[in-house]
Amino acid sequence: MRRRVAACLVVWGCGAAADGDRVTLELANRADYLEARLEDRVLGPYVAVHPGVRVVQQNTATYQAPYRERLLTSMAAGSPPDVFQLDNIDLPALVSRGVVLDLAPYLTRAAVDIACLDQTVLSIFSRGNAVYALPRGYTPLVVVYNKDLFDRAGIPYPRDDWTWDDFLRIAKRLTRDTDGDGMIDQWGTYFDRRPFVWIPWVWAGGGDVLCPDGRRAGGCLDAPVTIDAIRWYTGWMTRQGIAPRTHNLLKSVGDAFRLFNSGRVAMMTTGHSWVPRLRPYVAAGRMRFGFVGIPHRAGVRPATAIYASGYAVPALAARRKLSIELAAYLTDSLADAVRGEAGLELPALTTAVQALVAGDTLGWEAAFVRATAVGRAPWGARIERWREVEAVLPDLLDRITLAGADPGAAAHDMARQVDRVLGATR
């Protein structure tokens, strides 16, 4: 593994060091404090063999939209970072503006073998033969479940081929009044109104929020199969009572995790970022967890979304060779292994994933890999105006779960609203 990294580093050479100049490369990402320390570990070997290069992280530790705006502002001002983290949702906007470099012509010289990457993840950052970012890591959305609650109820752990009927039956059995006060205090699942979470459930039911070309919602968001999927998903709250009412919950990002790690919710939709948060509970013997693919409607193929990030280079990079070399290093085997061990994401390199699975005694990584096999690129990686669409979609579920609207009527109204956002005509 280290030999491959070293080979990658010497291809471009150390021109800056040979000239006696110390070059500073700016690396922009959304890392928080702990993630930034992890990236420092990743960068250590690179800096060691590049004495003439200094890498400075620009850590914004912010949400995706503000990060993108800061990135676009720096590019418009002519002072972009040398390398930057590119999330799948930002790709369409940056490509359409022509501000991100197509790396494809440089990959051979940079010793990057894209055949070693997960091809679904690679496709997220590709347009035809163009490659606009080297994928760093990714996660499919899956279901995490509390094994202790399953064991107490005598319920076998779910398998990847489970259906919506299986899920509903299990969730009902795990929804309980545990203290006999007449109030439910343990729920089978958790209802999440965020589109990036619930859209994979709609896919697993055979529906979709946009039509295949991504240009309109009409005829797809309000198609019978999608309406049925939305009715089933919102029914967790409106009819089945297997999820806590969202308006009774605190509006905190950590709400869902607290409900789950306190044993009040048995199953949740989540991604790989929960792995490092759950490990301490398992290590301390406090709780046991499992991961499994999102269940599907009987007769419909399983499906989920794959969310990914990569490292890209600005089209007007001042130090193009060094920038491409750094991006290649940050997505190579050693870097992927370090991040994979930290648990924040699955590595994009298939060999790194295989090593991660082989060393995982809990079986968590294998579950994520199996889910990846039925994953697809999210809409945010395909259409530029997805942020605007995503901003209005939660209202669809709110109208059904809080205002009592009919799912069909609400979906029809939302399809018209989304079409206006996209500029489509009905």
Identify the residue ranges that each predicted region occupies.
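Extracytoplasmic/periplasmic substrate-recognition and gating elements
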Residues: 48, 54, 153, 235-243, ...
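A structural signal for short loop-to-beta-strand junctions that line the ligand-binding cleft
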Residues: 80-82, 111-149, 186-188, 295, ...
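Hinge/lid segment of periplasmic solute-binding proteins
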Residues: 88-140, 290-292, 357-361, 372
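Short, solvent-exposed loop/beta-turn-alpha elements that line the ligand-binding surface or hinge
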Residues: 104-117, 160, 179-188, 207-229, ...
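Glycine-centered hinge/linker elements that transmit conformational signals in sensory
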Residues: 170-172, 215-248, 294
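Long, aromatic- and glycine/proline-rich binding clefts that accommodate carbohydrate-like moieties
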Residues: 292, 341-395, 399
